[in-house]
Curated annotation (Swiss-Prot):
Catalytic activity: dTDP-4-dehydro-6-deoxy-alpha-D-glucose = dTDP-4-dehydro-beta-L-rhamnose
Highest classification ranks of the organism: Bacteria, Bacillati, Actinomycetota, Actinomycetes, Kitasatosporales
Keyword RNA-binding: no
Function summary: Involved in the biosynthesis of the dihydrostreptose moiety of streptomycin. Catalyzes the epimerization of the C3' and C5'positions of dTDP-6-deoxy-D-xylo-4-hexulose, forming dTDP-6-deoxy-L-lyxo-4-hexulose.
GO MF: dTDP-4-dehydrorhamnose 3,5-epimerase activity
Pfam families per UniProt: dTDP_sugar_isom
The name this protein goes by in its record: dTDP-4-dehydrorhamnose 3,5-epimerase
Length: 200
């Protein structure tokens, strides 16, 4: 587990074991995650998406608490996966980091309170993500992924394909004005409570 530049985001790289029968790989290890985070976020739901080239999903997040941590793996094809610091008061507020996921040996962990988005770089890009909480429509929010205030460097030469919901999402300044973004100190307090309990 390697921490990324946005606090609360981690890159996990796992090994595969191959022989003449094929290959075996451990995609997710609660022990490894607990060792890095200090708590086990738990798995409440497993989601799978299949996207054609150019599909752009996000920037999504859920209200805190409990919000929704994600463990993201691209099983086939390729995506540019982006974590965004949308926590007001954070020293890296509005910062983002992009990771190309095109190998199931690499996964991205996105802590509760952070924003998450990805663009499919190929057709039939299959992404599986484990979430610490189930989907709760009334607590789900989004920031427009093409918001110039975020300035995410999506790949040139690929026309973004957005859902109507994501296309209508406000920019980060408007979300901050509405008071809908997570607060950094509240996120830290929530994280401390998880560490004290040892689980999400």
């Amino acid at each position: 587990m390697r921490p990324l530049s946005v606090q609360g985001a981690w890159l996990s790289e796992t090994r595969a074991f191959a022989d003449d029968r094929g290959e075996f790989q451990e995609l997710y290890s609660a022990r490894s995650l607990r060792g890095a985070l200090g708590y086990d976020p738990g798995v409440a739901q497993v989601n799978r998406s299949v996207s054609r080239r150019g599909v752009l999903r996000g920037v999504h997040f859920a209200q805190l608490p409990p919000s929704q941590a994600k463990y993201v793996t691209c099983l086939s094809g390729a995506v540019l996966d982006v974590v965004v610091d949308i926590r007001t008061g954070s020293p890296t507020y509005r910062a983002w980091e992009a990771v190309r996921l095109d190998d199931p040996h690499r996964s991205l962990y996105v802590e509760a309170g952070l924003g998450h988005s990805f663009m499919a770089l190929t057709d039939d890009a299959v992404v599986v993500y484990l979430t610490s909480q189930g989907y709760a429509a009334g607590r789900e929010h989004g920031v427009h992924p093409l918001d110039p205030d975020l300035g995410i460097a999506w790949p040139d030469g690929i026309e973004p394909v957005l859902s109507e919901k994501d296309r209508q999402a406000p920019g980060i300044a408007e979300m901050e004005r509405r008071g809908l973004l997570p607060d950094y100190e509240e996120c830290l307090a929530f994280r401390r409570s998880l560490c004290e309990r040892g689980t999400g």
